[in-house]
Curated annotation (Swiss-Prot):
Tissue: Expressed in brain and heart. Expressed in brain at protein level. Expressed in prefontal and visual cortex. Isoform 4 and isoform 5 are expressed ubiquitously. Isoform 1, isoform 2 and isoform 3 are not expressed in the cerebellum.
UniProt-listed Pfam families: RGS
Protein name: Regulator of G-protein signaling 4
GO cellular component: cytoplasm; nucleus; plasma membrane; protein-containing complex
Reported function: Inhibits signal transduction by increasing the GTPase activity of G protein alpha subunits thereby driving them into their inactive GDP-bound form. Activity on G(z)-alpha is inhibited by phosphorylation of the G-protein. Activity on G(z)-alpha and G(i)-alpha-1 is inhibited by palmitoylation of the G-protein.
InterPro entries attached to this UniProt entry: RGS, RGS_RGS4, RGS_sf, RGS_subdom1/3, RGS_subdomain_2
Domain RGS: 62-178
Residues linked to a lipid group, S-palmitoyl cysteine type: 2, 12, 95
Length: 205
């Protein structure tokens, strides 16, 4: 006579439960990857539509050229997001926004928010700083000024310049923008500019 689940040993029930949990996790991870992939493709389309190839080529000259341009910054951020390492550029952006604050009364709360998010030991998006710079920035939090993150921002910029920026220039995120013909744009009638190639970029990913 069939006893159903009640007749199974406890160890079997635990194994089945563990397997169900693992399958659920894998399905969620798969959905997340597909979602991120879709977002990355859309990001590249928007970027293509808003910038010329001449400008894109300037991005290879320096990291400063890249992130000082709105679309270049968006492209670089999308690339870092695909590598799950966008905390460095997020910190750099936060520092740039911080330096634009005009009201002295707003400096302290904003500084503490940036510190807690990127620099403290329990930071949710901790950036890779050497101990000296981290300690110096921590001391600056006692009396935050408009320049209290300058040294830390400089270190993170140099880190991105030597590492992620070089990878970005070799990635499809950049190569598809600087050379849209590699996506088959030359086969499309009327493809006269990078904007015309926008719809083709996602198909190359």
């Amino acid at each position: 006579m069939c006893k159903g689940l009640a007749g199974l040993p406890a160890s079997c029930l635990r194994s089945a439960k563990d397997m169900k949990h693992r399958l659920g996790f894998l399905l969620q991870k798969s959905d997340s990857c597909e979602h991120n992939s879709s977002h990355n493709k859309k990001d590249k389309v928007v970027i293509c539509q808003r910038v010329s190839q001449e400008e894109v080529k300037k991005w290879a000259e320096s990291l400063e050229n890249l992130i000082s341009h709105e679309c270049g910054l968006a492209a670089f951020k999308a690339f870092l997001k695909s590598e799950y390492s966008e905390e460095n550029i997020d910190f750099w952006i936060s520092c740039e926004e911080y330096k634009k604050i005009k009201s002295p009364s707003k400096l302290s709360p904003k500084a503490k928010k940036i510190y807690n998010e990127f620099i403290s030991v329990q930071a949710t998006k901790e950036v890779n700083l050497d101990s000296c710079t981290r300690e110096e920035t921590s001391r600056n939090m006692l009396e935050p000024t408009i320049t209290c993150f300058d040294e830390a921002q400089k270190k993170i910029f140099n880190l991105m310049e030597k590492d992620s920026y070089r990878r970005f220039l070799k990635s499809r995120f950049y190569l598809d923008l600087v050379n849209p013909s590699s996506c088959g744009a030359e086969k499309q009638k009327g493809a006269k500019s990078s904007a015309d190639c926008a719809s083709l970029v996602p198909q190359c990913a």
